[in-house]
């Protein structure tokens, strides 16, 4: 993969536009609850500041309506947190597309939520050209959005005088290549979470590559349905049962497996006060909701992880935010932390689980990408990386 790297360039005195991924979770009061993505963007920003560049950073946050900036869509909390990390004040610039603001060499500003700009998501050419005029060097450091061709991830890279990969983007690509192109076997993928339909096609692709495919959350429930099990009121997608069957068949033909839960933790509601019951997967009642894997299943998953050569982790296996449904994810996280295998983990919920169980130092590489992380594993062309390759040619 041939791209220009930020560290290959002389950025001193240059106007540098960095597209970062600062899409961090916030609570209802607007407080940032987990800041891994901001921390991950620091190396490129610091590198440019230390070299005396005039630095502009932008990101998306949430899913705003284009053309409307609402309070909850503002990057203001991110500007404050970024300033604390850099020990400097970071100005937040609104209505920035047409310029009209000044950035001094050695200064960094944050450009307000790029998804508020009309034409961002549709990769509008006119918008991309305007943004390209703001800089001498465009840096894509947002691996998390590399699978989307948008104006700040793709369009601007066509028109900026120079387009390169930031330090995070470069590290992401190197780590993912190591996990995918030459993985040490057995290769184990853990795919969990509630976004069933968005991950099933990716599961299909992983089915032809991995030795074991551990599924969790809403995804596992769909597989349990496919296996003829009753899942009560659990989150699942019955219309995708056929797809789940196909995945299990692909794995079986290769001598690989999808180890399904044999015991589960159920409750009649998802709440902090819910009473958790550990039962066999054959004893799920009509009103039960499966909210975690049971201890026997967790131990089985831990054993698979202990014997792995490479581990790819995206998504928890239960509602780990609530302590009574966190056991499965906790045991799995611990197994990954203690494993000798090269492990790569990614996705918002996964990052939160890693933080909760304090295993960040024991994971081989933590990816900041969710969908991009999985699509790269699938071998899809990521538009944001493809355009950087094109510009380097």
Curated annotation (Swiss-Prot):
Q: In which pathway does it act?
A: Carbohydrate degradation; glycolysis; pyruvate from D-glyceraldehyde 3-phosphate: step 2/5
Name the positions where substrate binds.
21-23, 37, 60-63, 115, 148
Keywords, alphabetical: ATP-binding, Cytoplasm, Glycolysis, Kinase, Nucleotide-binding, Transferase
What family does the entry list?
Belongs to the phosphoglycerate kinase family.
Localization per record: Cytoplasm
Q: Does the keyword Acyltransferase apply?
A: no
What GO annotations for molecular function exist for this entry? ADP binding; ATP binding; phosphoglycerate kinase activity
Protein name per its UniProtKB record:
Phosphoglycerate kinase
Protein residues bound to ATP: 199, 321, 347-350
- What PANTHER family does the record point to? PHOSPHOGLYCERATE KINASE, PHOSPHOGLYCERATE KINASE 1, CHLOROPLASTIC-RELATED
Predominantly, its location class is cytoplasm
One GO biological process term: glycolytic process
Reaction(s) the record says it catalyses: (2R)-3-phosphoglycerate + ATP = (2R)-3-phospho-glyceroyl phosphate + ADP
Report the gene name: pgk
